[in-house]
């Protein structure tokens, strides 16, 4: 009774399953690794081991019993192979008894016995197993020999049975080779014997154990003991030399007809052939392989020459020629020359067949993928939709894929065996052990590349086929069922009818076999065999329409073996069938042989593509007496590292195929070898390899994107010229295929799903931090000229971060930069860059650089008066952290070198871009603080001392003295100042520091103005400001933001969408956009006030001078107006210093004051004079100016070289002074001037002038009164009348109000305000800066 799913609870299950099919279980991640094994039910179970043989009645049922026993022996033998191959010596870790008198020797022997007894028991079981296996094999050979027909040269055995005998022989050969290889078996047994001998008295049954141990000792000690025992037993069997050749010939037939799929089957056939020949051959003439008629030596020689080296097990291999040479009757003439050095050995090297392999891969992948896509498209159209390809074609294409995989895997394993047999014995190689010579140093770069590509082709094709198994398996099973039924119900049925008709009473055995074949495999449409149709009277022929049920029901493993056995038995009776009938049997047999592989497609693919042998190295561990080898010698890691180090971009997509070999290795360790310690070793090695992979891959990825960013940022014309001249295309980003690799979010290794993208993102985060720290550390170890390099590196890192962000989820660059720059730490919120800039400005830039007003640049002074500055050590050069590679580093170094020898506008622009305006107040404040310290602590004492040392009279000589007289006069007067010991290292050095600091602030202000103008020009269109609207703007109380295009258009759109809510899905997001537009407009709209950083700096500088203003302004003049002959004001001292600066050099090799200190010296002096209100008195009474005026008025010019040099220096300084005063007057002009009317004295004996002041303009008078009132409020001690002022000193220009956010200056010091002739100045020109804002 069937269950209706719609009317039962199962309907819900079906519905849920249908829903599951709609879920996207696969992402868009590209497949770059082997297919992960899935857990599922295998409908075609091959593990039944003929337990269902009783269901089929055939004459071969008895044979299946023997095959069942041999299958059990093979399974047990595999366990012994695994045990012997993976055996590790226990005696190495056990303590030994060193002396006979040792106290604890009993405990040591008991412990050794307890540890070794289980292992020795395994060895005894192994010894007994090989005896039983030899006996079993010989019994089967004896039974076959009894059925041997010498005339027909046939035996009563099927191909399947002979295949089992082949596998038994291969098992014995492998066990013998492994036993010979493992010397540790004898070592452990010797320890065990020593312990047993000491503890013999305490044990029971020692005599039996002694004999058993002796037998085991002989078994382990004798080489080839298993082969010798087998050979001895075989030679006691009659006609064995007639049976064994059939085994060899069947092996040769299978190899020539390629009747195998698994690589292990091919290698088994190759290993057994020379082994059987050795077993047949003996020293006597009766058993001579050269004279045995059933053996074809030339045929075997061709096969051996084509495959001279065959994998044995793991890292062991055998040479077929060496096995044959062990035969007593080996004839080199019959076998031919050695094959190890022949041309056929080139077939082992994959590199020679890689091109045709790649071509075959591309062709088959396209064909298979097209087939799968067409099948899926047909299934999608409907379940009854016919397939686009014939089902037999689908089967043929799938079988072709298995054959291709088998051939490629065989090539990989055979090349590995070839390398093991041909180690690299170059004496120049520094190999620590033999394993390095067969693996690490035995593969060239080209061979590694070829091996990687072939492994990738194997794994990718296997992955594609396994993914399509669920789609193909029903079709394959249906096709197999159809072919089998067509053969049985059509071909076999006709053959039976014909055979019965021709042989009505003969050959009943053949009839019985055909009848059994039909009964075993037939599946009638109606459930029973239909009756034969009666022929018509007109025609003797009968037309039958055979109906074959379309079922996806393949034969069981036992059923399939019996079918093949019966067909093979019928084919042996070739003479009893016609040629057509025999061809039908042959065609079906050739197809049916591969059914077992197609019916278990996944397990077949897994077995075919198992490359675990590339990792196992137990033979070489035993040979080199080591516990394990380092990962540098492991072939999977060697191939992975080769991909990472290779310049071939196509290899990077194959990165996880070599690493996936660890999956095969771990699979074998757990499920086949059953050794947990091997899995632990594999897991530990994989962990190391994966860490190294992440480290190297992360570096490679970062280097690639770093190079790409450097190439993008490099000036294009400059890059083109460099490539033409030097680098030849090496400045472009190298090609790579990281896109696929960087999107991998679930890589499977040892059953663990790994998010490669996430792990790489973590490392990229760290690498960016390290790169930023490296760039800042380099800046901290260099002077201020490296700020351009720092900006270039930061821009490069920022672009690298942007490129990486396309693939990785990494932290924002601003947060990373702030973290590394320590601008958000608890220790400092200013940042390392800002602090180092301040340090360089104060400690190196101000005292050690000279300014040139013409070039507007600072250069390093030829001689410095300060101690050598100690900076942090320069970090070790890292080409990747610079600009990616050596070529780009050289290109950028050439461009950065242009900014290394000076400090100018480019450097200040870099400072502004790096630190931003938010950090400028700190820099300005620290520079001004340094100025204040220098004026207060250094300059003030020296100026006071020098003023006291000035000559009593500094009256300017009259013009009649001429230039020489005037020059000599001042030389004599100022000689003491010239020879003042602290003049250069202290006085002028301090003036230079002040001047450099002021010039730096001036240049910084210019850069800020340019930047603001550029930003305004970019923002103006969005603010609605154009040249036309700018001119026509009138003052208005309305907010200009309301009329800007950016805000007004968004505001209108928001209002429109608010009125139509059905259109807008998210009104809140639109309101946020409007609010952001408002903020942006307010941020970028220019202010009405014209801000100036330099103006604020000068204001602060003026307030600093209040500390020394009274001392440097001198005493009031005796005449009430001005003192002409002598003065203690600062400008007189600066005139003296300026004259000393222009003093000609006595030695041409000496450096002048101007060369040593630069124009910053004049900036300091002029700024002090300007803000002390002494500019015009300085210009009137300066010594150098006076000499220049005398020289200009002289009728005859002086021709003395010293005077000429003086005139030249004085004129240069005068021009510089004029330029400086012009700038200072522009930014901080003096107060409006007041006219002084000097009335003549009433009498000739008048002792003083009467000064009366009249004010011509009412506005001027009001302004002076306001200033006086402010001064009276600040200082209560200030007295005097504004109408009667002393002319001893002019008041300094008051600082303008602060407009840049800097703190207000301290209150001015108390001093007497007075007006003088210096108060007159022309109106200042308008300051240059941002265009004036529109009136409100």
From Swiss-Prot:
GO cellular component terms listed in the entry, alphabetical order: cell leading edge; cell-cell junction; filopodium tip; pseudopodium; SCAR complex
Biological process terms in GO annotation: cell morphogenesis; cell motility; filopodium assembly; mitotic cytokinesis; negative regulation of actin filament depolymerization; pseudopodium assembly; regulation of actin filament polymerization; regulation of translation
Matching InterPro entries: CYRIA/CYRIB_Rac1-bd, Cytoplasmic_FMR1-int
Signal peptide feature range: none
Disruption phenotype: Cells have no developmental defects, but cells are abnormally large and show a highly motile phenotype.
Region (Disordered): 1262-1336
Family: Belongs to the CYFIP family.
Record's function text: Involved in regulation of actin and microtubule organization.
Name this protein carries in UniProt: Protein pirA
Native species: Dictyostelium discoideum
